[in-house]
């Protein structure tokens, strides 16, 4: 079952024209009504969590395919489209771009009360929203900074997240989709339908290959704080060699095409080092950091150590735990204790629709065709003018 997906595309800085946004709101209202009437509110939320479906919906509402603005404008248009009709339609949309994303918990609480959900369910929705944002900003450190977070949920408590990060260096944006169904483990491969137009190296703590690193990271904060601080100092004492210039006394214990795990031994201590090629850390700064210089990190680690989280998800959920904390623990687990993390991009395949820049890339053609065919059928049922309806269906080209 689809749980989470990622889409990567060009980063736009322009503003959506007022006339286009108003048009998208109008069409979005009609399309939302048709989808919910045809499939129900739970299915509407599920389809929002599908990157291909979401992209197709943006096309129906007359927005460019391959542009970051589709995410922010489409979610804003849908939110405006159902305003005042949430209870009747059975769906609720919270959050948005920038500062609006910070209002997500407040809006979940407000709409949850209107939907007459239990306080326990509302708290669960707020937790899922917060954790989805934390996972994609702290566990998937792919060079994209989250700046947009939108949370969808139904009258029955089914939820989806559509959030977006930007990479200004590469002038690209990446969209992350989450769906509640079967997302039982939020920190181990919570993604299935992943779409991207390129690979980006970085720390991927959601990969199953990072499961042992997660385990050791948790054990580090469950143990002695002083021992953890000594481990961090040990990292700065022995800089990691990326060019394979091993000194006397270093021996290779295992290797892969990308990396070599080595150990240094002396009378008092043993240190496991990782020799990594530039491929692994082309854009990832983790090896260049001296974690002993951050008083804030030491403070967070002390507070986490006092709590002693039971598992990695609880560790991530704690206040103050962010990308730097995750990196520090991951590198300690990897270098000193030999628990190698994954540095592979979670994106696995991509789809092509030309967009405004007409750049082709691989496509999941069967899924795309099925989505467009369904969208055409739904568009034919929209209560809009004949001319407008023709324009909508003309944009859906198989």
Residue map of PLM features:
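Active-site-proximal structural scaffolding
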Residues: 50, 144, 293-297, 308, ...
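Phosphate-backbone recognition surface of nucleic-acid-processing proteins
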Residues: 327-383
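Intrinsically disordered, low-complexity, charge-dense segments enriched in Lys/Arg
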Residues: 375-398
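Helix-hairpin-helix
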Residues: 287-294, 311-331
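Short acidic (Asp/Glu) and glycine-rich catalytic loops that position anionic groups and cofactors
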Residues: 32-37, 308-309, 349-355
């Amino acid at each position: 079952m689809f749980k989470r997906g990622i889409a990567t595309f060009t980063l736009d800085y322009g503003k959506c024209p007022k006339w286009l946004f108003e048009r998208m709101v109008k069409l979005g209202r009609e399309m939302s009504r048709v989808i919910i009437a045809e499939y129900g509110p739970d299915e509407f939320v599920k389809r929002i969590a599908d990157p291909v479906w979401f992209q197709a919906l943006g096309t129906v509402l007359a927005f460019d395919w391959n542009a970051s603005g589709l995410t922010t404008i489409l979610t804003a248009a849908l939110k405006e489209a159902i305003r005042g009709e949430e209870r009747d339609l059975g769906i609720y949309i919270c959050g948005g771009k920038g500062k609006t994303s910070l209002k997500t918990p407040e809006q979940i609480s407000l709409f949850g009360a209107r939907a007459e959900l239990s306080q326990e369910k509302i708290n669960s929705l707020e937790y899922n929203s917060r954790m989805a944002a934390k996972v994609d900003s702290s566990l998937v450190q792919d060079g994209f900074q989250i700046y947009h977070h939108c949370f969808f949920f139904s009258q029955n408590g089914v939820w989806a997240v559509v959030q977006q990060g930007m990479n200004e260096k590469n002038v690209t944006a990446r969209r992350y989709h989450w769906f509640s169904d079967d997302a039982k483990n939020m920190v181990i491969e919570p993604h299935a339908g992943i779409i991207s137009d390129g690979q980006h190296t970085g720390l991927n703590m959601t990969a199953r290959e990072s499961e042992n690193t997660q385990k050791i990271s948790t054990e580090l904060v469950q143990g002695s704080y002083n021992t953890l601080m000594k481990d961090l100092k040990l990292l700065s004492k022995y800089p990691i060699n990326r060019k394979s210039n091993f000194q006397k006394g270093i021996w290779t214990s295992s290797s892969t095409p990308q990396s070599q795990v080595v150990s240094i031994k002396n009378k008092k201590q043993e240190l496991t080092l990782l020799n990594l090629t530039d491929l692994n850390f082309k854009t990832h700064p983790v090896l260049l950091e001296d974690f002993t210089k951050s008083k804030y990190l030491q403070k967070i680690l002390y507070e986490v150590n006092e709590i002693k989280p039971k598992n990695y998800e609880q560790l991530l959920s704690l206040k103050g735990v962010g990308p730097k904390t995750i990196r520090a623990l991951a590198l300690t687990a990897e270098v000193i204790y030999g628990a190698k993390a994954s540095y592979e991009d979670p994106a696995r395949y991509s789809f092509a629709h030309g967009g405004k820049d007409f750049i082709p890339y691989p496509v999941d053609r069967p899924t795309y065709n099925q989505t467009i065919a369904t969208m055409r059928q739904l568009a034919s049922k929209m209560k809009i003018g004949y001319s407008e309806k023709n324009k909508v269906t003309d944009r859906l080209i198989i």
